[in-house]
Amino acid sequence: MADKTPGGSQKASSKNRSSDVHSSGSSDAHMDASGPSDSDMPSRTRPKSPRKHNYRNESSRESLCDSPHQNLSRPLLENKLKAFSIGKMSTAKRTLSKKEQEELKKKEDEKAAAEIYEEFLAAFEGSDGNKVKTFVRGGVVNAAKDEHETDEKRGKIYKPSSRFADQKNPPNQSSNERPPSLLVIETKKPPLKKGEKEKKKSNLELFKEELKQIQEERDERHKTKGRLSRFEPPQSDSDGQRRSMDVPSRRNRSSGVLDDYAPGSHDVGDPSTTNLYLGNINPQMNEEMLCQEFGRFGPLASVKIMWPRTDEERARERNCGFVAFMNRRDAERALKNLNGKMIMSFEMKLGWGKAVPIPPHPIYIPPSMMEHTLPPPPSGLPFNAQPRERLKNPNAPMLPPPKNKEDFEKTLSQAIVKVVIPTERNLLALIHRMIEFVVREGPMFEAMIMNREINNPMFRFLFENQTPAHVYYRWKLYSILQGDSPTKWRTEDFRMFKNGSFWRPPPLNPYLHGMSEEQETEAFVEEPSKKGALKEEQRDKLEEILRGLTPRKNDIGDAMVFCLNNAEAAEEIVDCITESLSILKTPLPKKIARLYLVSDVLYNSSAKVANASYYRKFFETKLCQIFSDLNATYRTIQGHLQSENFKQRVMTCFRAWEDWAIYPEPFLIKLQNIFLGLVNIIEEKETEDVPDDLDGAPIEEELDGAPLEDVDGIPIDATPIDDLDGVPIKSLDDDLDGVPLDATEDSKKNEPIFKVAPSKWEAVDESELEAQAVTTSKWELFDQHEESEEEENQNQEEESEDEEDTQSSKSEEHHLYSNPVREEATESKFSKYSEMSEEKRAKLREIELKVMKFQDELESGKRPKKPGQSFQEQVEHYRDKLLQREKEKELERERERDKKDKEKLESRSKDKKEKDECTPTRKERKRRHSTSPSPSRSSSGRRVKSPSPKSERSERSERSHKESSRSRSSHKDSPRDASKKAKRSPSGSRTPKRSRRSRSRSPKKSGKKSRSQSRSPHRSHKKSKKNKH
């Protein structure tokens, strides 16, 4: 009975409170109507009421004073009432009896009191400060009788939402909703002062907990966003750690990538990460160098070097960093190829790092990939369409323009329009905005914009149909109109216009698919060429080791280990060591140390190390040079003791090599002799080169099929060419050079046999001298023949005496010029062409190459075979034809050359002999007048000579001419012949001048002067006889 009264009072108070809220809705009305008076409660139940009412009073005050600002108390109170009025009063339950209602409420009050007491202890006694203080639902503490017993929400603790809920449009409370009894405020103040102090503390803690809850919700949102992009499971970190990692990402979006570069990043086993951890970076290396080094493997999403910030980090003298690729495949290739590689003298130590967000556009694109994303060059076709051949090979030349319309349409229908996304962000945004309005408003909008922005350079893509921006605009507009998404589109080729070109859309994101195989091969073009060679850093390190090498065991061991570790470049290392031993100024201890290094490397060349055996092979070719240089060093040592010490150390190496059996004993003996100076390496090279040339000609010179001495000694127009293809030429073999075959065979037998190929200059000197001697006498004959030819043309009406004289000169000219090819090979002609130039030899090679090509075509059936001839005969006939053509060309060139030489000599002789021409002619005229008995004239009015002197003179002239020609051919170098030439020269020189003067006069005078020419040799002959006597 004692517990029934509080339930009744609570019911009455709730009714009063409900009516007050509906009537006024003010907080003062709530406070006046919430507390029951003392007269309403029985006296036996009053001792229990202070405890309950005290808690309710505190709870209501907490809810009212919860806001940091007093001016917000009213709307907050209404929201609280709204949020807590969940239980609805139903009129259907009022039929229950008062007794049943009291029993039911008694049980619920006991449960609620126990829960509230626990909450009270937790909130005010500080048992768990981190717990959020909760509110009791309105129907839990003071539920009405008419509430449903089966309500699912009954008995549950309410968790409040954020304090900053939307207060602009609060929903209207329904007529059935009533304020909860939890907010009833008593008029009596609680007797405990300690509770008041705790009340203030709980208000602060409540506000703090709500702020924490807001922060947690925000952290959860950021964590979810990050997990979707980073492919990582949800983390179970504490609130403080999550806040510390996410605060910078809220300040700056790009810093979210950098926050993951924590110093302790390590491989978390994520199979989708593209981020590489670099653990050993040179302090002088920057991000740009990393881009150049790692960008060869694919586009990069981010590059970051963790620069040292403390003295301890700077003391390490190495940095660490991260390089993130756009896709996993490129990152795996970079890890495989660069892990352990020396970059700027630091060995790269790579590993997988934590995944980072991948941006839409990379920060670095490889040049090979950039070329494929660039627009194609101008082609002249509509929309800059590219022919398929040129699209595959951009360096291919442009095709000529089609001649007719059909060819143009065919080329256009097979071409491809390549769409490239513009890289300029402003232009790309403008194109997208334009497409948006054109799709919405129609083509009239595009026409209006073109009319309005005709002078705006930003809208040039609407007018210039060949530009990549217009191609992208046209494709993107078509794609949107066909139903494609702005971010996802179809990538297969299609025709936009009927009978037009194919359009090739851009890939969705080319950087996420990795580099193609062609681009990978382009990126690694230089790798195969570097195989078997030291890198620049390794070469510098080797040179540094050799410069600082001393005869200490540890130093030589370290150098030997370096050589074996880089055995792939054994040849380059051997060359470097050989070069270091060839310097005479090197101190003796360093030379000995380098020789010991050679010995150690040779000893370990049989070790189970990859490519170590290469050292034995490459050192074998260089040891002769090494010991020759050591011999030069040994001879330059001044002190006897020092030289003996040096010698003993070198000989110790020989004894060790003999024990190790690295090389055979004869080779070691040879090396020892080279070092002691008993064998000269240069002489050995010469003796080794002799067997290569035993055949008398190098391999290159045998291309023309003839030995060197035969090629040099025979002119091209009279060459027998016996062994061009191994078969003698029958038609040209017999008497080509005018010498019988037996004589040539005997002369060949008498020739000395050369063990070494004779020099091509040995047979040149005599032939040149002989040719020069012949040419000096030859030009005089040429002058006489030319003069006699001129006289013959001018003196057709001469007498028989002059005709005989000219006939003799004609016969001599015929002997010199009109002979056949076989008669040209006289002694003088043969000696003139004794030396064969390189040009003639080259022509012979060309002829033989043509013959070989002709023979190959005959054998393969490209050329028809002539009936009645074998292959060999047809080839020989072809060779003869080529040689005959070459001979004719050579003869024409020789004639032109001789003609030019004659003209030069004539011009010189004219200038010298014009001065002495007049005086001798007057003397001859006087002599003629004095010797002739009867001055009778000829038929033309001139003197007529007696027949007897004329015949005598003609006979004398013939004899003198024959004797002079004989003396020239037989006694070429005799002094008598020289004196005869000197005496004949004035008469011979006067004759052509007089004949030239006679051309301007009548033929009679020319005839007279031609007779004087015939007498001139006779007189010179008489004078020579007088001189003899």
From Swiss-Prot:
BP GO terms, sorted: RNA processing
Residue numbers of Phosphothreonine PTMs: T719, T931
Bias (Acidic residues): 786-806
Membrane-spanning residues: none
Family of this protein: Belongs to the splicing factor SR family.
Cross-linked sites for Glycyl lysine isopeptide (Lys-Gly) (interchain with G-Cter in SUMO2): K80, K145, K168, K208, K748, K749, K760, K829, K832
Gene3D superfamilies: 1.25.40.90, 3.30.70.330, 6.10.140.420, Surp module
Basic and acidic residues bias locations: 55-64, 97-110, 144-155, 186-222, 239-249, 810-841, 874-922, 950-980
Keyword list, A-Z: Acetylation, Coiled coil, Isopeptide bond, Nucleus, Phosphoprotein, RNA-binding, Ubl conjugation
Coiled-coil region(s): 92-121, 192-232, 837-915
Organism: Mus musculus (Mouse)
Polar residues compositional bias, start-end: 7-16, 169-178
One Gene Ontology cellular component annotation held by this UniProt entry: nucleoplasm
Name the record gives this protein: U2 snRNP-associated SURP motif-containing protein
Pfam family membership, one: RRM_1
Subcellular location(s) of the protein: Nucleus
